Amino acid sequence: MWGDSMRELGDAMDNELNAVKPVVEEGGMDGARKFIKGKSFQKSSTEHMLISPGRDGSVPLNGLKSSPADPHLSDVNSILDNHRGGGETALTSVNNIIMATSTNGDSDGVDGDAKRPSISNCSSRSSFFDTVLSTFSLKSNSQDTVTNEVKNIEVQFASEEANKKFRQMFKPLAPNTRLITDYFCYFHREFPYQGRIYLSNTHLCFNSTVLNWMAKLQIPLNEIKYLDKVTTNSSAISVETVTNRYTFSGFIARDEVFQLITRVWSKENLTNINDVLEVDERVSKKKGISSTPSSIFNNVSTNAYNDFISTTTTEPTSRASYMSENDMLIEEAIRSVDDYMGTPRASPSSSSSSSSSSSSLGSSTTYYCRPVYRLKPNAPFQYEGPFHVQETMDFPYKPEANNEYVLLERQFSVPPGLLFIMMFNEDNPVFELSFLKTQDSSNISHIGTFEKVNKDGQHYREFQYTKQLHFPVGPKSTNCEVAEILLHCDWERYINVLSITRTPNVPSGTSFSTRTRYMFRWDDQGQGCILKISFWVDWNASSWIKPMVESNCKNGQISATKDLVKLVEEFVEKYVELSKEKADTLKPLPSVTSFGSPRKVAAPELTMVQPESKPEAEAEISEIGSDRWRFNWVNIIILVLLVLNLLYLMKLNKKMDKLTNLMTHKDEVVAHATLLDIPAKVQWSRPRRGDVL
């Protein structure tokens, strides 16, 4: 019975809608009002359709007529004043359907009117024709309501100093962005990152510095779609945008934080909606476009009628299946107005405006910073190579396997290419000149560029200098001829430089040459440099002083390498600084691979090394030095205890010798001892009077 009634009602509404459409298009507002007041359904058929049967099949007749005492019909009384006695209009029929579908039809003694929801308190249950009329006029009071709600939301901004620090921390922000407050929390990705969340009037930002890595997160408020309290964590808040979902936890007072974020977020969204309505109105006036009645029927939404039933009744949505396709026009007209006036279902105009507004303020971006070592502005060098790489590799050449003596293998806080430019600079070889002067060298010729090419296609350069010799016999100085060959130069992988030094003025000087190899590569983090130095003596003829020459060369190379390390540290400290570079992509942690194969760089998801942090190699060296220092102190203490123990044993030994001597000569001591005759008892008498003492 209920299904038949709904189908009949749908047919009646379809006829009513088809009849009102041409009248509205021709007569405008006045024609629509006259038609609504003059047109009515047949009362008998309407009553038949609107009566909801009870459990026993009886049909209650109360509650169907409009009267001032019935609050559920108060919204339509003003429209139906002239037609109460003549029959119920289509407007009354629509409203009565809403009430009938919201009533369960139970006859348990509870009045059916008490169960009906109030139409006046629910904007989504407003009557169809009232909605159509409101669409013609584009009610301005709805915009005023939005504006008033925005004005009523009061927030207190942070101080100017805090706002200045906030803008320095998050620079790509709109000029009108102001900080409201910030909270300590954890940002969850693969693992929680400790930091602070910053709430402004336009953005929700997060900054973290954990494990020497840094991340910054900026979420425009107008891109946030949902805010929720995480049920599994009593201190967590979930923020969801169109593309991502972010979880923050560790709030001391989550409810207060959630309430403030929600208020600011609501204010931003309401302001955007109000701006959209004002812009649309100005554009319409500027172009001379008026909201004609025909536009209501041509620009309706495409929402299904079952959504309308689900929002106006507590009954299951399956009742919508009994409605005809033409009934959707009623829902479309209602939804078109609700969507346009800023209900939770966003209209296309508001979506496009929101997207354009978000593009002007920047999208939700997460960017990372990594530590890099750069040249200071006062550095006399120029370097245009990479400061960080994603993949590193070991040296493809092994000096140990080629009978070369390794002098050094150490890490420096500088990119390999930058260290190479510093040590073998072509335009300003200040480092090499300083190093040669520390080795008692003079008369240094011009150190040019690697423009010469040998038969193997390798670039090299040559220069000469005079070196003082400190040998007890032989010449006091010698001329040194140096050829520096660039064997391999790839700033993203490794660099190999071979320095050949000949000393023709020394004994057997034409029979040998000293060859020093300098190899540069990236460290495992892809930020610093591993410098490896080795040497060997290359003989082209035999010599009877070969062992002595090799020994002197080795000692001289070891001493020169120590001076070289000190000079490198001075130059790095003077001309290199720790800086930050924006990381576009991040790679996973490196894996230990075989010799010569590429490996991933240690680049965690959030990156920023603090300036005061030490490189790993320096930390290890300092730790080893402290261990050696503790070891030396332990040895000293043990040595002192051993000396004291030895002294005590010597003293004890002397005492034992004395006791032994006494035991050996005890008879002689007794024989030479003087005997004393001590009487056992001495009698004393009291002197009498007259005795002379």
From Swiss-Prot:
Residue numbers of Phosphothreonine PTMs = T343, T593
- Which residues fall in a compositionally biased region of kind Low complexity? 347-362
Q: Where is the VASt domain?
A: 403-576
Instruction: Output a single Gene Ontology CC term carried by this record.
Output: cytoplasm
Molecular-function GO terms, alphabetical: sterol binding; sterol transfer activity
In terms of Gene3D superfamilies, this protein maps to: Pleckstrin-homology domain (PH domain)/Phosphotyrosine-binding domain (PTB)
The answer to keyword Cell inner membrane applying to this record is no
Q: Where in the cell is it found?
A: Endoplasmic reticulum membrane
- Coarsely, its chief localization is endoplasmic reticulum
Q: Which residues carry this modification: Phosphoserine?
A: S591, S594, S597
Q: What parts of the sequence cross the membrane?
A: 631-651
| Family according to the record | Belongs to the YSP2 family.
Instruction: State what this protein does.
Output: Involved in regulation of various organellar membrane contact sites. May be involved in sterol transfer between intracellular membranes. Selectively transports sterols between membranes in vitro. Involved in stress-dependent formation of sterol-enriched vacuolar membrane domains.
Q: How does it assemble?
A: Interacts with the ERMES complex.
Tell me the protein's name. Membrane-anchored lipid-binding protein LAM6
Source organism per UniProt: Saccharomyces cerevisiae (strain ATCC 204508 / S288c) (Baker's yeast)
Q: Gene encoding this polypeptide?
A: LAM6
